[in-house]
């Protein structure tokens, strides 16, 4: 890990904490799109973010008018360097309260994902994991989402 990477983690974490303080005051309604991205070998792509702990599905926020499938693809381009993909479909939508936000999380299955990792301000590391042998350190919400989506494959 480079010096820049080492310094970025606490800066990004502090920025995320400030965002959460703002959400505590405002209690916004938000929309998220999260990709259950499978490689051609059926490996699940997970990311480790600089500002949050645990392995997570690639994803992020989107506007109310943006199609969640398009938002998931945008997030895959930004976070893992998406090059191409196969079938894409909505697995489910979940209403949840996260960090003082009322969030509608769209879980999107994206198959046959090909990507070329590149450096990112947001993503510290990318891995591929077998659905039968998920890595230690999954974020709790990620574990829950994987269980929900796996039942729909």
Predicted regions and their residues:
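Conserved Nudix-box catalytic region and its N-terminal flanking loop in Nudix hydrolases
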Residues: 39-78
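A short coil-to-beta-strand element that immediately follows conserved catalytic motifs
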Residues: 83-93
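Short strand-loop junctions, especially beta-strand C-caps/beta-turns
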Residues: 60, 131-132
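Conserved hydrophobic "DFG−1" position in protein kinase catalytic cores
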Residues: 37-38, 46, 110, 128
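Active-site-adjacent beta-strand/loop module that shapes the phosphate/pyrophosphate-binding cleft
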Residues: 93-117, 125-127, 131, 145, ...
């Amino acid at each position: 890990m480079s010096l820049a990477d080492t310094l970025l983690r606490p800066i990004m974490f502090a920025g995320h904490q400030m965002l959460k303080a703002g959400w505590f005051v405002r209690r916004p309604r938000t929309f998220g799109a999260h990709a259950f991205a499978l490689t051609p070998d059926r490996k699940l792509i997970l990311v480790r973010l600089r500002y949050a702990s645990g392995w997570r599905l690639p994803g992020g926020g989107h506007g109310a008018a943006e199609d969640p499938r398009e938002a998931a693809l945008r997030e895959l381009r930004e976070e893992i360097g998406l090059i191409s993909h196969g079938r894409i479909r909505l697995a489910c939508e979940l209403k949840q309260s996260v960090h003082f936000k009322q969030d509608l999380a769209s879980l999107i299955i994206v198959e046959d994902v090909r990507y070329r990792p590149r450096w990112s301000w947001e993503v510290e590391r990318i891995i591929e994991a077998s659905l039968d042998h998920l890595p230690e350190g999954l974020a709790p919400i990620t574990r829950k989402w994987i269980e929900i989506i796996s039942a729909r494959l």
